[in-house]
Amino acid sequence: MLDAPEQDPVDPGDPASPPHGEAEQPLPGPRWPRALRASATRRALLLTALGGLLIAGLVTAIPAVGRAPERLAGYIASNPVPSTGAKINASFNRVASGDCLMWPDGTPESAAIVSCADEHRFEVAESIDMRTFPGMEYGQNAAPPSPARIQQISEEQCEAAVRRYLGTKFDPNSKFTISMLWPGDRAWRQAGERRMLCGLQSPGPNNQQLAFKGKVADIDQSKVWPAGTCLGIDATTNQPIDVPVDCAAPHAMEVSGTVNLAERFPDALPSEPEQDGFIKDACTRMTDAYLAPLKLRTTTLTLIYPTLTLPSWSAGSRVVACSIGATLGNGGWATLVNSAKGALLINGQPPVPPPDIPEERLNLPPIPLQLPTPRPAPPAQQLPSTPPGTQHLPAQQPVVTPTRPPESHAPASAAPAETQPPPPDAGAPPATQSPEATPPGPAEPAPAG
């Protein structure tokens, strides 16, 4: 956290100036009891465009999974935004796209332009002068934007600026987060400052930025951390936050290793099944080695790993992290405290390991499987359908004898139709006529004698 002066400035002509004869120097350590007033020294505000928290006067950009406007509003309400001084760091106005900034821990107002080959905390993608925007929102007499509006401006301006800056090297799942740096309320009011810097940073523990070397487009942007790193959790949404924290603090995941896909796939992006098989095997081995002599099943945690998308692969990312954690049934994540290799707590309770599987059950001898001897199908299954000569005869049922050969049925069933004796009446129709045929009419009278 940035430091505030213990005494208010006494120079009425310049509220941002320190008392006469004293140098403006930050005090060591967080001291804000009396600093939440408009007379605080110059500060810079850093905002994460993709995740999270508007920070006033300190560098605590936390890239969360998804946006968290509720946390933003709650944080500002509980810790009002300190005003910044009217005097602006000279580097702030001289910086250009591609420049890199470095500052001591917690003092972004002391940012200086350095070579990107050296350690730095911020890479500038674009310097945006909001005075060029239409309307009166950024006019000379306009009030400073609210924290929620600053969040919105950052999302609208900085994400597009970073995409333009990196081009095909933009990795949407990069370990670097899109951020905004601006001078703050007092510079807005007293100096008419309307400039903001959109760029990239690497969030680190204790709400600080990790220093890195080289330009983002030229280095591996893979979102990985050393084994043993714990990643935070958003207490409001129960979602992971890709920021390292102390494992003794609440967190969502613990990193157990990293896998380099280029070792197996040096050329084109492998398919999802190919990635999954390779990463799963490698992560399983690494996690077993990381937890030894413990076993993953005794922690009741789950092995977690991502795969790479085409945009990430095109940007040059090749490495993924293996982690362990626990998900909830509602889509959230369990809150872990302490390392999985120690006194782990899951949602405040120690894990209850499942019963051990006896060794003899893990190595059961193979059981010989005796297949039944195939039997010939019974003759009844080979019977043909009822012959056409009988199946349509009215009031006559086909004769089916399963135990007889099928060829003996055809003549037997067809014989009655040809050899049936005629009825007693000599004038009846032939035997081939249907029994239900129309009866003969009355006999003609004998001719007269």
Curated annotation (Swiss-Prot):
Q: Name one GO cellular component term.
A: peptidoglycan-based cell wall
Disordered: annotated span: 1-33, 349-449
Keywords in alphabetical order, please.
Cell membrane, Membrane, Secreted, Transmembrane, Transmembrane helix
Per the record, the major location class is membrane
Q: Name one Pfam family in it.
A: Septum_form
Q: Where is the composition biased (Pro residues)?
A: 365-387, 437-449
User: Function of this protein?
Assistant: May play a role in septum formation.
Record-given protein name: Uncharacterized membrane protein Rv3835
List the source organism.
Mycobacterium tuberculosis (strain ATCC 25618 / H37Rv)
